[in-house]
Amino acid sequence: MKKIISLAVCFVMPFVLMGAKTAEDTPPTTSAQAFVLYCPDNNTVICSKNADERMKPASTTKIMTSLITLEEAASCNSEVTFKQEMVAEGSSMYLKVGEKVRLSDLASGMMMASGNDAANAAAYTISGSPEKFSQRMNEKAKQIGMTNTNFVTPSGLDDDNHYSSAKDMALLMSYALENDDFANLTAKKSVTVEFLEPKSKKTAYANHNAERTLFEKYKSPSRKIYRCHRRKNRLYNGGRAVPCFLCQKRRCNACVRHSE
């Protein structure tokens, strides 16, 4: 699965590193089901394939959940006590019932460890339930201009009514990176969370980002890749999802979707 996702990202990279020609050029053949290379500076889609097709966003959903969490934490970085109702299947930052962290720590757990438990905890803390939190997610999506998106779960676990598109995810990533807290978090190689309870507990979460490693090989003084959202490459049921990354030189966002 890692190999296939990397191939999909490699497909987009020539446009980022070598420079796209024009939006009118015919997109090259790719095994990716959908992709978009988007420049937010002039709101231009440089090239794409099935950019508006509705697909399951999987754990890239946590871009939105983390963004809202960080926005909320900026005004009130409250204590969060992890409860049984917040437990979630799938990937986790391994919170235990009764443990306490800061609200902002949940964003770290989402972006570094892809923690479904962190996403659930944020939803309950901010809105009282995942259902109410999803309403806030959809309000934010509408504000950003995401027209082919509907969020149902804060973590991205599979639901027939939970969908987005490559273009919408590029718009979301562009918007999210305008938030300094989000941009700084996603640029880190690791984050250490100091728990409030138990006070002696500290856990380091590494950003195992294949795209970051891949892009390091292509760095040059004039075209430096400097920020990348952690790859989210699977749903609970094993589906494949959407890498999102940013190029500094041309300030372009790319999102790729690879299906089975």
Give short role names for the model-derived ranges:
Residues F15, V80, M93, C247, ...:
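Preference for bulky hydrophobic residues occupying beta-strand positions
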Residues K2-K21:
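Sec-dependent N-terminal signal peptides of Gram-positive bacterial secreted proteins and lipoproteins
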Residues P28-A32, S129-E260:
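Penicillin-recognizing serine hydrolase domain
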Residues F15-V16, S75, E197:
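Residues in and immediately flanking transmembrane alpha helices
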Residues K2-K3, K49, K62, K232:
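A general lysine-centric signal
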